[in-house]
């Protein structure tokens, strides 16, 4: 068997296995499994190292908090601005997040938007419950993003030893 076949097989087993575990945990505990997959992508996008994953988790949760703030700020401005309150508040929030790209430590602007998307897609009202319902599967997804390359490398080495 070729090395490429072993690598693809290890990737299939590890990534597919972890994805199955995420879905099972989500169904078992009523978590938003799709948030874990978004966080997993954010972890891989950030480089899948411990410090980069921590920054990705922070950015994703900050994005979810930004989504909550949009929900909170839209309500009082609706009385004054009517149907234009949501677009204006969202425009200001997204614009401020986009400006973060200029700061070297805040370069994961797309991950902020992934967190905001996770909040809006959850359909939950703004509040702590929404943030907790996003934070728990986000941590699970970041853990999968960190574990996947480690487990894949471990499995590839074991397979290479068996095939020699």
How should each PLM-predicted stretch be described?
Residues 1-49, 127-134, 142-164:
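Alpha-helical transmembrane segments and their membrane-interface boundaries
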Residues 12, 16, 20, 60-64, ...:
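Alpha-helical transmembrane spans of integral membrane proteins, capturing the lipid-embedded, hydrophobic core
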Residues 18-26, 66-77, 96-100, 121-122, ...:
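Alpha-helical membrane-inserting segments
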Residues 23-37, 74-91:
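Structural signature of hydrophobic alpha-helical transmembrane segments
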Residues 30-48, 95-126:
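Pore- and pathway-forming membrane helices of multi-pass small-molecule/ion transporters and channels
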Residues 33-71:
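Alpha-helical membrane segments and adjacent membrane-interface helices in multi-pass membrane proteins
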Residues 52-62, 104-113, 127-139, 156-162:
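A cytosolic-side transmembrane-helix exit/cap motif
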Residues 77-112, 164:
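Internal alpha-helical transmembrane segments of multi-pass membrane proteins
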